[in-house]
């Protein structure tokens, strides 16, 4: 066969750092390196095969042929002199006969995007009047739907972060200047030659040609191609070595591609993307020694072995996590998924889940990569320990939970290991306008996505979550949603995202309950056939007390101190940080007996919050120190997934579903001994003494739900509240859309609430549309901005100006730190406060979204004096805002 005329004159990778060997890697070799990774990964994952072959009549062999063909075209935009002159030395080395021609300017090369240009050139070449023999001859035949190629080309050329669509592209931006016409002609011939070569390499052996119509393009292709490109660029001393020697013919290229399979297998192993799965052994394998499956756990083996959406409703502490994990294990064992992703509402709950998953990971995989992803995961000591273990003990028996360094380099890669634990916003990014969102989409698509505390999300976030569920359904993925209970309307909306059937959910009063919906139908599972596994019926004694602004009065505070003196573990849950701080201060003033009092909320630095969280778990956890009485004043941070246990709970009024979450921390664990007077679980609920809920409506704006919850509490009239009965009886009626007799102020409040909800739904739809048009940077500030409607916080950096520079709260001087240390110091010393505080400051936010606030250090801590407010910070109380009686 004749040597190649054009394609061997283009470089794909260039490096001056290699100490030996070539410093140029031919473009055609790089493209085949990437295709080799895709080929090897395909062979190792039945899940990926089934995903790409979903709803296709073509054989897997032919789908794979098209897949490799298009992936090898991912860098077609590099067949362009404007890219080649990014390393003019490399170009001239490969083209010694053309050094005298004037090349493109440095500025032109710097602005050149080979991904976007690749899509442009594919579009232009396809419309060209010049014929490319078999390849573009089909463009002359009007009936041929050549548009079927564009989704594939758009996906693979978008591998650097954002998928462009041909019809939306500014084509004038990529037109070749007339001064480069001679180069343009050669570039076009090279692209045509490369397409013909790829046809011979991949399509012809599968009985296909470029005149055939490819299958529908999977939404996972962009992520798959991007990952293959990352790994195919992983040049080491023994993988994907640079090579600038031109192949003699097509057979030499075929041999090169086959030889790269070993390199591909090696980098896949190094990356941590693949792992050996362990055979499913049942839910009992995940339980501690001596424990047997209970409640819904006994139903796992009966659940469908098929992709679907599963909604698990069960009481707090009933083993929902193990139920979900066992079902995920079962699906992985049957090659319906490759991995597991746990998404939780907060960083604290994600940290707690990481601890639980470390013990379970080795049951599912022989060498699992366990990854934690949220804005502060790099400061989680357990996660850092797991990462270090992978380095120091790789290959040894005790290294049974690994954390591949490559996977842990960024949050987006959490979705590529075997078990990922993250905050929910990391999942929502997969459908939002953020760079490389399709990497997250690929990871989710090949995983069982488990979303915990699904009741905790507002309308905006639920709108985004529904988009994630629909995307998962489109690729045949699986999702498990966990909640103590869900209102019927919300459950219906979630289930309707999956499959073609949208039959109404039967109003089944059974509890606990599993609803499953797949492509071909729906099933429901309960414990009616296993009455011995029904959760034990228990009661809580509500004690409603009406107080101004729902604030504990002197009598209540004194009762709390007396209870702690009697040995009780007492918790007061406040709806607002400011309220919690005031209550804490008043308790400290009244505490003459030195009862241990803690304050826990979200307005601490990361270091202080971590210390507070550990102290709370140590004192009030399952194995906490219960030798003396204590008091914890907290906000909502204790109501979600933290395993804490109190003898007496006092809580400000809140919606019923969240109230039940809080009550789940009361007598959470069976104990032989409770202090005298606290043998029966009593929950004191602070209600308003008049109409309306005041500032609490800023947090819980559904006034109707708040009012109906209050009515249910008051209607008990001293009777006990029985669980699990209340989950269904209360929530279904409280969240019922049907109107009932209610005061005028409730109706007025609902008008405002429904207007705000409508705006949130609109924002969710709008931001989902933006995902097709824009690409924002993948950083913490962007993630917060697009995933949490109206909840954007303001990161404050308190400091004291010294002669050496800015001294941060932990005592470090910012200017004395290295760049890496500065980055870490900013994360550890900032405090997130409500964004509304910004109007009190004249200081401006810097380019990283931080507001530096210069204050002074006194004996009590850091203090800043403004015109109308005083802000202080101590490790004990966190950041407080005080409005003086006589402001400046």
Curated annotation (Swiss-Prot):
Listed result of changing residue 75 to A: Loss of CRISPR immunity to lambda DNA and of CRISPR-mediated plasmid curing
Annotated positions binding ATP: 314-321
Family matches, as Gene3D superfamilies: 1.10.3210.30, P-loop containing nucleotide triphosphate hydrolases
Highest rank taxon of the organism: Bacteria
Assembly behavior: Interacts with the CasA subunit of Cascade once Cascade has recognized target DNA.
Binding-site positions, Mg(2+): 75, 160
Keywords: Antiviral defense, ATP-binding, DNA-binding, Endonuclease, Exonuclease, Helicase, Hydrolase, Magnesium, Metal-binding, Nuclease, Nucleotide-binding
Gene (name only): ygcB
Record's protein name: CRISPR-associated endonuclease/helicase Cas3
Family designation: In the N-terminal section; belongs to the CRISPR-associated nuclease Cas3-HD family. In the central section; belongs to the CRISPR-associated helicase Cas3 family.
Free-text function comment from the UniProt entry: CRISPR (clustered regularly interspaced short palindromic repeat), is an adaptive immune system that provides protection against mobile genetic elements (viruses, transposable elements and conjugative plasmids). CRISPR clusters contain sequences complementary to antecedent mobile elements and target invading nucleic acids. CRISPR clusters are transcribed and processed into CRISPR RNA (crRNA). Cas3 plus Cascade participate in CRISPR interference, the third stage of CRISPR immunity. Acts as an endonuclease, a 3'-5'exonuclease, and an ATP-dependent dsDNA helicase. Anneals and unwinds R-loops (in which crRNA binds the target DNA, displacing the noncomplementary strand). Unwinding requires ATP, annealing does not. Required along with the Cascade complex for resistance to bacteriophage lambda infection as well as the ability to cure CRISPR-encoding high-copy number plasmid.
Domain HD Cas3-type: 20-231
Protein source organism: Escherichia coli (strain K12)
All residue ranges annotated as the Helicase ATP-binding domain in the record: 301-504
SUPFAM superfamilies from the UniProt entry: P-loop containing nucleoside triphosphate hydrolases
Annotated EC: 3.1.-.-, 3.6.4.-
Cross-referenced InterPro entries: Cas3-like_dom, CRISPR-assoc_Cas3_HD, CRISPR-assoc_Cas3_HD_sf, DEAD/DEAH_box_helicase_dom, DEAD_box_RNA_helicases, Helicase_ATP-bd, Helicase_C-like, Helicase_Cas3_CRISPR-ass_core
Needed cofactors: Mg(2+)
GO biological process: defense response to virus
Observed phenotype of the null mutant: Loss of plasmid silencing.
CDD domains: Cas3''_I, Cas3_I
Motif residue range(s): DEAH box: 452-455
């Amino acid at each position: 066969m004749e040597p190649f005329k054009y394609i061997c004159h283009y470089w794909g990778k260039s490096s001056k750092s290699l100490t030996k060997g070539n410093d140029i890697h031919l473009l055609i070799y790089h493209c085949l390196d990437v295709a080799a990774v895709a080929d090897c990964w395909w062979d190792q994952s039945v899940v990926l095969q089934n995903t790409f072959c979903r709803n296709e009549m073509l054989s897997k062999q032919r789908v794979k042929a098209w897949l490799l063909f298009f992936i090898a075209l991912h860098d077609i935009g590099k067949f362009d002199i404007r890219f080649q002159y990014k390393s003019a030395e490399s170009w001239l080395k490969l083209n010694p006969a053309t050094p005298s021609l004037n090349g493109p300017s440095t500025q032109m090369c710097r602005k050149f995007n080979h991904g976007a240009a690749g899509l442009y050139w594919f579009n232009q070449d396809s419309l060209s009047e010049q014929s490319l023999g078999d390849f573009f001859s089909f463009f002359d035949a009007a009936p041929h739907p050549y548009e079927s190629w564009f989704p594939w080309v758009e996906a693979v050329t978008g591998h650097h972060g954002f998928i462009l669509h041909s019809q939306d592209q500014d084509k004038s931006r990529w037109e070749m200047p007339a001064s480069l016409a001679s180069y343009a002609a050669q570039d076009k011939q090279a692209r045509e030659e490369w397409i013909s070569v790829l046809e011979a390499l991949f399509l012809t052996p599968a009985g296909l040609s470029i005149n055939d119509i490819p299958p529908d393009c999977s939404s996972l292709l962009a992520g798959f191609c991007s990952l293959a490109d990352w790994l195919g660029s992983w040049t080491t001393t023994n993988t994907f070595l640079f090579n600038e020697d031109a192949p003699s013919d097509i057979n030499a290229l075929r041999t090169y591609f086959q030889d790269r399979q070993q390199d591909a297998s090696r980098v896949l192993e190094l990356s941590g993307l693949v792992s050996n799965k362990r055979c499913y052994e049942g839910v009992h394998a995940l339980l501690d020694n001596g424990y047997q499956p209970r409640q819904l756990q006994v139903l796992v083996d009966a659940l469908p072995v098929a992709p679907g959406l599963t909604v698990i409703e069960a009481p707090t502490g009933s083993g929902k996590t193990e139920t979900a994990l066992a079902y995920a294990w079962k699906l992985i064992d049957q090659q319906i998924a490759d991995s597991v992703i746990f998404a939780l509402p907060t960083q604290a709950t994600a940290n707690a889940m990481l601890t639980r998953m470390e013990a379970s990971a080795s049951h599912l995989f022989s060498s699992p990569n366990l990854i934690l992803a949220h804005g502060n995961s790099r400061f989680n000591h357990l996660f850092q320990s797991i990462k270090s273990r992978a380095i120091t003990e790789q290959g040894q028996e005790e290294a049974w939970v690994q954390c591949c360094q490559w996977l842990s380099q960024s949050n987006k890669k959490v979705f590529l290991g075997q078990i990922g634990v993250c905050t929910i916003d990391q999942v929502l990014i997969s459908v939002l306008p953020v760079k490389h969102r399709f990497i997250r989409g690929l990871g989710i698509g090949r995983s069982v996505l488990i979303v915990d505390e699904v009741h905790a999300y507002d309308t905006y976030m639920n709108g985004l979550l529904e988009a994630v569920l629909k995307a998962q359904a489109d690729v045949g993925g699986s999702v498990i949603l966990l909640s103590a209970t869900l209102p019927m309307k919300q459950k219906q909306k979630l289930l309707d995202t999956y499959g073609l059937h949208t039959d109404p959910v039967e109003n089944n009063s059974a509890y606990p309950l599993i609803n499953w919906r797949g492509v071909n139908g729906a099933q429901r599972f309960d414990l009616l056939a296993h009455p011995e596994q029904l959760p034990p019926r228990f009661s809580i004694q509500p004690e409603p007390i009406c107080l101004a602004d729902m604030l504990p009065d002197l009598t209540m505070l004194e009762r709390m101190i007396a209870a702690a003196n009697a040995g009780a573990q007492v918790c007061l849950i406040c709806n607002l940080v400011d309220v919690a701080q005031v209550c804490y201060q008043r308790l400290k003033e009244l505490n003459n007996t030195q009862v241990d009092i803690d304050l826990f909320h979200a307005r601490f630095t990361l270091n202080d919050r971590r210390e507070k969280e550990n102290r709370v778990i140590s004192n009030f956890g399952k194995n906490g120190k219960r030798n003396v009485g204590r008091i914890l004043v907290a906000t909502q941070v204790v109501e979600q997934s933290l395993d804490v246990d109190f003898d007496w709970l006092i809580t400000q009024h809140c919606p019923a579903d969240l109230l039940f979450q809080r009550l789940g921390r009361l007598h959470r664990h069976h104990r032989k001994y409770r202090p005298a007077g606290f043998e029966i679980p009593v929950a004191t609920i602070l209600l308003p003494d008049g109409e309306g809920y005041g500032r609490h409506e800023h947090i819980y704006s559904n006034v109707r739900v708040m009012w109906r919850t209050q009515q249910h509490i008051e209607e008990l009239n001293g009777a006990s509240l029985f669980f699990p009965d209340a989950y269904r009886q209360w929530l279904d009626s409280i969240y019922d859309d049907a109107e009932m007799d209610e005061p005028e102020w409730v109706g007025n409040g609902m008008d405002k609430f429904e207007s705000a909800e409508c705006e949130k739904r609109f924002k969710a739809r709008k931001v989902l549309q933006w995902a097709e048009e824009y690409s924002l940077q993948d950083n913490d500030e962007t993630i917060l901005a697009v995933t949490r409607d109206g909840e954007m916080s303001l990161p404050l950096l308190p400091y004291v100006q010294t002669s050496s520079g800015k001294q941060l709260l932990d005592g470090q001087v910012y200017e004395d730190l290295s760049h890496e240390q500065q980055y870490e110091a900013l994360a550890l010393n900032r405090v997130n406060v409500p964004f509304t505080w910004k109007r009190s400051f004249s200081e401006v936010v810097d380019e990283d979204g931080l507001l530096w606030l210069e204050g002074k250090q006194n004996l009590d801590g850091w203090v800043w004096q403004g015109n109308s407010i005083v802000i202080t910070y101590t490790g004990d109380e966190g950041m407080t805002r005080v409005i003086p009686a006589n402001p400046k």
